[in-house]
Amino acid sequence: MAMVIWLCMGCGSSNTTHGEAEMNRFISQLMKKMTLEEKIGQLNLASNWTYVTNATLSEEDVAIKQLKEGQMGALYGFTNPKQIRQLQEVAMQGRLGIPLMFGNDVIHGLTTTYPIPLAISTSWNLDLVEESARMAAREATAVGINWVFSPMVDICRDARWGRIAEGAGEDPYLGGEIAKAYVRGYQGTDLAADTTVMACVKHYALYGGAEAGRDYNSVFLSRQEAHNGFLNPYKQAALAGAGSYMSAFNEFEGVPASCNDYLLTEVLRQQWGFKGFVVSDATAVNEMMAHGIGDQAEVACRAVSAGLDMDMGSNAFVAHLAEAVRSGRVKEAAIDRACRLILEAKYKLGLFEDPYRYLVKGRDSLELFNEAQRGFARRLAQESQVLLKNEGNLLPLKKSARIALVGPLADNAAEMQGSWAASNRAGESVTILQGLREAVEGRGSVSYAEGSWIFLDAAHEERVKYGLLKIFRPDMPLPPVHTVPQQQLVAQAVAAARSADVVVACVGEINNMNGEGASRTNLDIPDAQQQLLKALKATGKPLVVVLCTGRPLTLNWEAENADAILNSWNLGHEAGHAIADVLFGDVNPSGKLTTSFPRNVGQLPLYYNHKNTGRPHPDEAPYQKFVSCYEDVVNAPLYCFGYGLSYTTFSYSAPQLSSNRLSKEGSVTVSVEVTNTGERDGQETVQLYIHDIYSSSTRPVQELRGFRKVMIKAGETQRVEFTLTQEDLKYYNHDLDYVCEPGDYEIMVGSNCRDVQKVTLTAE
């Protein structure tokens, strides 16, 4: 039977094979042959933890027997093409020969690691975002992966949440544009091509709104705020044709996301028209028991009935759904719906036509970590850095200078990777020391000192650094984190600084300090590294801080005392080269923040598109009694959304409207002239914001509705235009109707959310 299905699939032309009518006929015929248990088996996603991950798969393994019996629809976590072929061969030996899908977390590259997604978002370059997904898909498919658990599109307003590193920041409009770019890059124009993968949009929904920034925590949002402030990136991904979604760990309105009918069915499918399937996050079905809504059988029934199609890692569907159907607790139509959607995904991927379509012998050695991948990673990292401060134009540095490069992240290859890096070649990252020394070869000099520990508390540093290893390899011996006294490390760095013209300090977070399960209540640069910075400042030498981080940090001392701050995030394999490119001016920095940097953790959650209160207070104004502000800090962030410096300067004309009235069917052009007033060519991201002055519901003080990244040569002026329609002015009102309300709107254009010029537009 397996051979018959495969050969019949190969008979038609590509257009016929991938046509919807042909697909529906094929799947309907296949499902008629499937037992209830086999249908439920398609709803089961198992992990590589089930198997011994070596070259040999035991025929006696329970998991292999389940696979042959059709009890698994997909597997995740495998990156060895030989193993993937072996497992697919086992699946094809089953009664109906239904191929497996192979999924994996490909968050910012596979073998070649790109900058973390938060860093990529600060490029504001949608072409680069799309290309990053396309390049990652090439590596993923080269090892046999055809389904990636990306993009992560959760909006986050609270930097305490570690998974802010995986998303695009705090703005739902920008997040939506970036989500579409990722989907286009991963899926291309033909899912059955051997270099495209099916995207899995996560974490649906509202996971980034976790209370107090504590991972997996409850989410408390109204439906109106959810739609206006958080859901747009998920919506845009659906409209872009994303093939699958992943449900989130959190609850919404008292119902876990993995069994939330409002999210899974009413919004995703009925309102947005999503046609693909939804998989749970890892063990999220079982975790609903801890939420207190039922035992394993109950949560499995509730999940599939609400619209969850695939269970990742809980084995709850396989364990309980057949009996639930027979007893009437679950309608068989729910099983059929989910099974059909998963079979459709396999069909669209071309797996029925050729289950081994990605597994071309030797392709992995050609595609992985090659020159093109490394070159692209460097280019992407160049545009994913944000210059926060540059007092007296200290940067760019001269390559003839004597540079003291110090800090625990200056020569640390593995810590360039960032969280959720999948590469098995982390040690081949270009360190910042390597990058700078290559750049100055034959001219200046770069001396190096480690400078400090990460934390003064060795036990805490060990918990953070080795946390994952202690979970997955508890018997593995681990080296001590502190081998040289802190005072000695600082003294060595100070000595290097005194002999240099300029000091570059590389400080911030190690990989495990951000990402999943990495919530923090203190967002300062860790204490040991602060000791180092203060000692370096005392030398009187110019101080450049290179910030390696996966989230916004509180940088009050650094902003006051450092001469320059370059926020380089976690940039991946080409970090050292890209940082050197920017520090020496071979590349003019053009990144702009997509998330606010707080002055104090007490300001969180903090976001530019907040609403006014009945007692508003200017963000930068000092404390005043009986208005909405703090006694001890201004409302404004230290660095605002959209902010980022360049080695040149730009000036803006006042924005102009083609008409001051906007009809229901018409459009208005907003134009502004931007002049490069400096001496270097540079890229500028021109941003357009709106504000509904009077509305039936309260509205944010600003909302991003457009941006253009343009290259402007020194001394030249470019006219930048935006086209607005009433669609751009719409929001979800109190009744959740998506409307543009007539009246006056402020249209704001500028270089960031704070530095804007305004004009008024009337919507009819």
Q: Which residue ranges define each predicted feature?
A:
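Short beta-strand elements
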Residues: 755-764
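Glycoside hydrolase catalytic-domain context in secreted enzymes
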Residues: 8-733, 742-753
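Bacterial N-terminal signal peptides
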Residues: 1-8
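Surface-exposed, short loops/turns at beta-strand junctions within beta-sandwich domains
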Residues: 738-740
